[in-house]
């Protein structure tokens, strides 16, 4: 497949969800079969280099990219969910937000000690969710093999929070 200018498939909506925010809408990329496939393929090629045993995707848009990446690599996908969404025993990680805190969970038996885990998500902003996801993975005894994103908002400096990890983003703003 030919290389695409992925940026042109992202719709930018100013002042959403509140004034001063420039929202990057990925639904315009997802609805275009060629662009969606090319984006997933580009992420697959990068993730393949880290030789993961599993892909982890944070709720909810991480599912849209993480699951097809796992499928293409022939490996499993583990969803990282908000509290109360998983029916079995879970492992959790709480992290601080600007105004409060949030918690992420995985099933306790989903990730095994020693496994290499790649995190795939739609967006790297401040790095808070991804950092918490990495801590959650490490809490299970597994290793973070790398992190891949469709979009990175560089001005929010999320990479600084992820120092020590291999980070890849397809589109940078």
UniProtKB/Swiss-Prot annotation:
UniProt-listed GO biological process terms: adenine salvage; AMP salvage; purine ribonucleoside salvage
A Gene Ontology term for the protein's cellular component: cytoplasm
EC class: transferase
GO molecular function annotation: adenine binding; adenine phosphoribosyltransferase activity; AMP binding
SS bond partners: none
InterPro entries: Ade_phspho_trans (IPR005764), PRibTrfase_dom (IPR000836), PRTase-like (IPR029057), UPRTase/APRTase (IPR050054)
Short name of one Pfam family: Pribosyltran
Catalytic activity: AMP + diphosphate = 5-phospho-alpha-D-ribose 1-diphosphate + adenine
Keywords, in A-Z order: Cytoplasm, Glycosyltransferase, Purine salvage, Transferase
This protein's pathway: Purine metabolism; AMP biosynthesis via salvage pathway; AMP from adenine: step 1/1
Domain of life: Bacteria
Subcellular location: Cytoplasm
EC number(s) from the headed UniProt entry: 2.4.2.7
Subunit and interaction comment: Homodimer.
NCBIfam families, per database record: apt, PRK02304.1-2, PRK02304.1-3, PRK02304.1-5
Function, in words: Catalyzes a salvage reaction resulting in the formation of AMP, that is energically less costly than de novo synthesis.
Protein family: Belongs to the purine/pyrimidine phosphoribosyltransferase family.
The protein, known as: Adenine phosphoribosyltransferase
Organismal lineage: Bacteria, Bacillati, Bacillota, Clostridia, Eubacteriales
